[in-house]
Amino acid sequence: MPAYHSILMESDTKLIGNMAMLPIRSQFKGPAPRETKDTDIIDEAIYYFKANVFFKNYEIKNEADRTLIYITLYISECLKKLQKCNSKGQGEKEMYTLGITNFPIPGEPGFPLNAMYVKPSNKQEDEVMRAYLQQLRQETGLRLCDKVFDPQTDKPSKWWICFVKKQFMNKSLSGPGQ
């Protein structure tokens, strides 16, 4: 079975580095264009997460795949935090904190995918990339809480938490041992 790739890349999609800055439906402020369709890159990443997380190798077919990879790795980080949460409210607080926590971007030490991502070419692009990734992180965390927590029990679903130990492409956005 092949890995799933993003189908959201358009010819006029803006790039930051070699990563697509795709539109998203978001309640958070940021540089991402507003999405008007039903599905955006975050929905796509969450939908394909359970299938893609098993792949150790992933062929990048377009710049949107780099955005998909980043969100997939971020979902793994979110699940590590959510497994320790006792309620959706606590999970949302954890996701907000994780979303705004300082994080490395391509080109900086500590970013695990520097071999596949181009660093921003100037200070302005650096700021736009950081803001876009933060917007993706915040919105992904919020939407993931809706998927992970069972509305009846207010506990994390074992069908999501079972993926905590899986590493997509043998990579992690957090350092070793975290």
From Swiss-Prot:
Belongs to the ARPC3 family. It holds the Pfam family P21-Arc. One of its GO terms (cellular component) is cytoplasm. It comes from the Eukaryota. The gene is arpc3-b. Keywords: Actin-binding, Cell projection, Cytoplasm, Cytoskeleton, Nucleus. This is Actin-related protein 2/3 complex subunit 3-B. GO terms for molecular function: actin binding.
